[in-house]
Swiss-Prot record:
This is 2,3-bisphosphoglycerate-independent phosphoglycerate mutase. Its EC number is 5.4.2.12. It comes from Shigella dysenteriae serotype 1 (strain Sd197). GO terms for biological process: glucose catabolic process; glycolytic process. Belongs to the BPG-independent phosphoglycerate mutase family.
Length: 514
């Protein structure tokens, strides 16, 4: 029989941030004798889980997807928003071969360049600065017919905030002496993700036929008319923007169409309507053969040009374990199962050689404040059994409670969630020590430590940009290093396991064996 393994265990307490202030802090308010004792008596440090340190814009709050990608990659993984910001600033964007190729081809054929996307400073699906850069790119390369089709936000931005953005673009086109805003429509229609094709059809007709329910001379006038109809940005009905004497902006074969959203989920449906020959979501009144460019890859099965293809991550923690013939377990509840598998593996769906997975069903309740402990007892039972099984070199576990209950904004429930976690950590730490293993306890981002927004007095249901704890439990004599971040965790684990760190991992070990 094989020798019993002493596992390196990583426990991710989702949404468990560190905040000095005690007011509205569910983690401080909860009775947590176990975490308090570990923090007092074990090697520990605070690490960054937001902003530039995880590849997000400066000071932007972290999230679970980004957090787990960084945790597993062992390097800062730049998110699309940040990558584009950097490339535009460095002018690399303006030489992107896919974007320049599409513009140059349309220009030389005397065709139009259509640019569409969510005109928003929200930074969730797109950013208006990127759209502005695309307008500049088209103009710099000599395109004469530049048409902007603006999808309006009001979800990731205030409900009526599009006017300043539209003004900015109308002023830009006036300064360039060419191009114009050709249409406006709310994201409710253009960016559906639930196969509500009747909505998408209205956006498609507006774009391809230059036909809508309403028409206005300018984008701002069109928006003001929508507000007068009591439509907020998100729900603005299809509006053609065309002043007297202007040619219409209906799409023609051979035109270029650049879709400037970087997030995939709400970009897929309208893209398929343009790109798929066998599209059957609705009967297209006009099938137009445009040179369609996706800013990022919206789906692997959409066959059209991509300006920024996905960067594949080589030698993530999971892949490196497999290459070194190590066994690993990923375990969580439904809510965070994808995070400890797909995201931790750098966007790879299939498990690696030697990788087992355990999924514990999250409770079927309307909102998790009704059951703040969630399925933590069953998760802990399975995790402890795996630790003691001697089967695994490493185990990655996520407890969702701090985040999922934090999102409800209910302080009492968040306190109960944190107290439930304390019992779980106790059992896990004891199990790890009983088999001579090692344990790292951390979080992917903050949430439960800030349950009220001091500015508004309302419940704070979002993530925070605060640091998260990192604690070592084990028999090695280690010293903590300050100034760490999530991408230092994988190298830390490898170093504690006595393994080589692959060169692709640029993170540094945060616990040095003395």
């Amino acid at each position: 029989m094989s020798v019993s393994k002493k596992p390196m265990v990583l426990v991710i307490l989702d949404g468990y941030g560190y905040r000095e202030e005690q007011q509205d802090n569910a983690i401080f308010s909860a009775k947590t004798p176990v975490m308090d004792a570990l923090w007092a008596n074990r090697p520990h440090t605070l690490i960054d889980a937001s902003g530039l340190e995880v590849g997000l814009p400066d000071r932007q709050m972290g999230n679970s997807e980004v957090g787990h990608v960084n945790l597993g990659a062992g390097r800062i993984v730049y998110q699309d928003l940040t990558r584009l910001d950097v490339e535009i600033k460095d002018r690399v964007f303006f030489a992107n071969p896919v974007l320049t190729g599409a513009v140059d081809k349309a220009k030389s054929a005397g065709k139009a360049v259509h640019i569409m996307g969510l005109l928003s400073a929200g930074g969730v699906h797109s950013h208006e600065d990127h759209i502005m850069a695309m307008v500049e790119l088209a103009a710099e390369r000599g395109a004469e017919k530049i048409y902007l089709h603006a999808f309006l936000d009001g979800r990731d931005t205030p409900p009526r905030s599009a006017e300043s953005s539209l003004k900015k673009f109308e002023e830009k086109f006036a300064a360039l002496g060419k191009g114009r805003v050709a249409s406006i429509i709310g994201r409710y229609y253009a960016m559906d993700r639930d196969n509500r094709w009747d909505r998408v059809e209205k956006a498609y007709d507006l774009l391809t036929l230059a036909q809508g329910e309403f028409q206005a001379d300018t984008a701002v006038a069109g928006l003001q008319a929508a507000y007068a109809r009591d439509e907020n940005d998100e729900f603005v009905k299809a509006t053609v923007i065309r002043a007297e004497g202007q040619p219409d902006a209906a799409m023609e074969d051979g035109d270029a169409l650049i879709f400037m959203n970087f997030r995939a989920d709400r970009a897929r449906e309208i893209t398929r309507a343009f790109v798929n020959a066998d599209f059957d979501g609705f009967a297209r009144k006009k099938v137009v053969n445009v040179d369609f460019v996706m800013l990022t890859e919206y789906a692997a099965d959409i066959k059209t040009a991509v300006a920024y293809p996905p960067a594949s991550l080589v030698n993530t923690f999971g892949e490196w374990m497999a290459k070194n013939d190590k066994t690993q377990l990923r375990i969580s509840e439904t809510e965070k199962y994808a995070h400890v598998t797909f995201f931790f593996n750098g966007g790879v769906e299939e498990s690696f050689k030697g990788e087992d997975r355990i999924l514990i069903n999250s409770p079927k309740v309307a909102t998790y404040d009704l059951q703040p402990e969630m399925s933590s007892a069953e998760l802990t039972e399975k995790l402890v059994a795996a630790i003691k099984s001697g089967k695994y070199d490493t185990i990655i576990c996520n407890y969702p409670n701090g985040d999922m209950v934090g999102h409800t904004g209910v302080m009492e429930a968040a306190v109960k969630a944190v107290e439930a976690l304390d019992h779980c950590v106790d059992e896990v730490a004891k199990a790890v020590e009983s088999v001579g293993g090692q344990l790292l306890i951390t979080a992917d981002h903050g949430n439960a430590e800030q349950m009220r927004d001091p500015a508004t007095g309302q419940a704070h249901t979002a993530h925070t940009n605060l640091p998260v704890p990192l604690i070592y439990v084990g028999d090695k004599n280690v010293k903590a290093v300050e100034g760490g971040k999530l991408s230092d965790i994988a190298p830390t684990m490898l170093s504690l396991m006595g393994m080589e760190i692959p060169q692709e991992m640029t993170g540094k070990p945060l616990f040095i064996v003395e």
